[in-house]
Structure formats: structure tokens, C-alpha cells
């Protein structure tokens, strides 16, 4: 099942029949671990990503980076309550000191694909997504990469075995494969880095 990590977390909490949870953030994984819904000993950070500021290819925006992000008329981000990229965006914008002043210009999306779409179609002047998402679209370009100093933790993608799985061996095999050099080679092709 593919969806935002927050939505997948909620589905697992409601009993979704799943074997493995591959999250785009540590918060959702930690919540499921704390609820004993993911086996703690199976969790590892497989990948790392970056948060980036994007604009449409044909955009005439004057926003040149995080320093003047407040100049944007509409800023698309994932909903911070359910979308990890949105949570990271909120953290970065809060640490920049602009979160409160841009509330009326935020367009909250249900996942990063919706953020991309809003920027691609210029329904939003700019957006905040992961670098790998930006790289997947030929209709957007990266304006700036979020400085790590704006985030308390790096953008890590943990994976873990769902405690209720009836397929423990298969889940462990999948996790082992996704952590392998062979899989990492493919992930790197799409802009990911090895997680810590």
C-alpha cells in the first residue's frame, strides 16, 4: 500500500494487514514502535533524503531561496499532521521564523505528489518536497536545498517489521534485501543516500 507515512501509520494502528512498514520519517515509525505495532529490533534507517524548495519550470517567481520564501503568494506543503515532508517543512519554516506569517498562503496537501502537482500546474508558486520527488518531475526545478541546521533530525527513511505479520521470515528477507548494496545502488540512482 502506498500513501503518506502518517496515513499508513493510522491504517496500521487500525489493524491494516501489513508485513513491513517503510516510512518517510522516524516520527511515524517511533509511534508504531512505542505502541508495539512494529518490532523494535527490526527497525533500521535505510535511506536519507533532503528537503528542497521547488518552483514550476516556467515560473516567474521572485523567490530565490529560503531567505525570501515569505514573498511567495501560495506555498504548497504536505499537511504536517500526516505527511512527513510537511512536518519537516513546518519545522524548517518555523526555525526560519516565517511559519506564523505565511499561514494564509499555505496550501496543505495530502502527500508530496499533490504538492508536486500544485507546483507543476502553477496552482502554487513554490513548494517544499523531498529532493527525490523533485527529481521525478521534469516540470519543476529546485530553487534551494534546505540547510540541515533548520531541521532537528535528518530526513531518514526507517523500515521495520509490523508486529502482527503472519509472514515474519518473508518480511525479514524483504528488509534485508532493501538494506543490501544491490538495493542501495537502485535507491542512489533516484537521489537517495544511505541512511545512518
For every predicted segment, state its role.
Residues 6, 10-14, 25-26, 30-36, ...:
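Exported/periplasmic ABC-transporter solute-binding proteins
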Residues 19-23:
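Periplasmic-binding protein-like
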Amino acid at each position: 500500500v502506498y500513501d503518506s507515512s502518517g496515513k499508513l501509520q493510522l491504517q496500521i494502528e487500525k489493524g491494516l494487514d501489513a508485513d513491513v512498514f517503510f516510512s518517510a520519517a522516524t516520527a511515524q515509525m517511533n509511534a508504531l514502535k512505542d505502541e508495539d505495532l512494529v518490532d523494535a529490533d527490526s527497525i533500521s534507517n535505510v535511506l536519507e533524503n533532503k528537503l528542497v524548495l521547488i518552483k514550476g519550470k516556467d515560473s516567474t517567481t521572485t523567490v530565490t531561496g529560503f531567505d525570501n520564501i515569505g514573498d511567495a503568494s501560495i506555498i504548497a506543503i504536505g499537511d504536517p499532521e500526516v505527511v512527513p515532508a510537511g512536518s519537516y517543512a513546518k519545522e524548517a519554516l518555523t526555525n526560519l521564523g516565517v511559519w506564523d506569517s505565511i499561514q494564509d498562503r499555505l496550501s496543505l496537501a495530502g502527500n508530496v505528489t499533490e504538492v508536486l502537482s500544485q507546483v507543476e500546474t502553477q496552482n502554487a508558486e513554490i513548494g517544499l518536497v523531498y529532493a527525490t520527488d523533485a527529481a521525478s518531475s521534469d516540470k519543476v526545478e529546485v530553487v534551494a536545498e534546505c540547510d540541515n541546521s533548520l531541521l532537528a533530525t535528518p530526513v531518514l527513511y526507517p523500515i521495520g517489521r509490523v508486529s502482527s505479520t503472519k509472514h515474519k521470515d518473508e518480511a525479514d528477507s524483504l528488509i534485508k534485501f532493501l538494506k543490501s548494496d544491490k538495493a542501495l545502488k537502485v535507491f542512489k540512482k533516484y537521489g537517495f543516500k544511505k541512511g545512518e
